Amino acid sequence: IFLACIALGTAAIGAVNTVADGIGKSISAQGQSILGGDIGFELVQREATADELKQINALGTLSQSIGLRSMARLPDGSDQNLVELKAVDNAYPLYGALKTLSGKPIAELLGNANGTYGALGQQILFDRLSLKLGDKVLLGDGTFELRAILTSEPDALSEGFGFAPRLLISTDGMAATKLERP
């Protein structure tokens, strides 16, 4: 029995080391796509100062995003749903690919057309609010047209667990919501 326990313990340690090595190699090979860049800086409840942005810009190409939870409301007020709101700039994503069912360029999907910014939502949001492409939702003071179903974000793994469906908008669209307060 003693020798069986030693053999079992040795096999378990070997298996754990093999799995850990595989995970490490995978992260090394796909780290940029998982993170969405080479380095990630996160600020909580404040914007980067001009000096901080200058220092970060000196490191290479910069992409900024804003994340928060908000309520997406139907224009008639009949329903609403909590969303993980993410606003991205024109450089997003630096690495990897944002995937939608439409396949159109992100700038076209999120841009301002006739005074309304675009938004990309996960299928579960469409299902919960009985939405279809072209429908509008309200976020804060802004109105957004749902232009595509979001299927994959390159940096989603680095952002941890979400409590609600993702809704992706542009940083210009975020300014229209007036959800950011000093």
Regions found by a protein language model. Give the residues of each.
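Alpha-helical transmembrane segments of bacterial inner-membrane membrane proteins
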Residues: 1-182
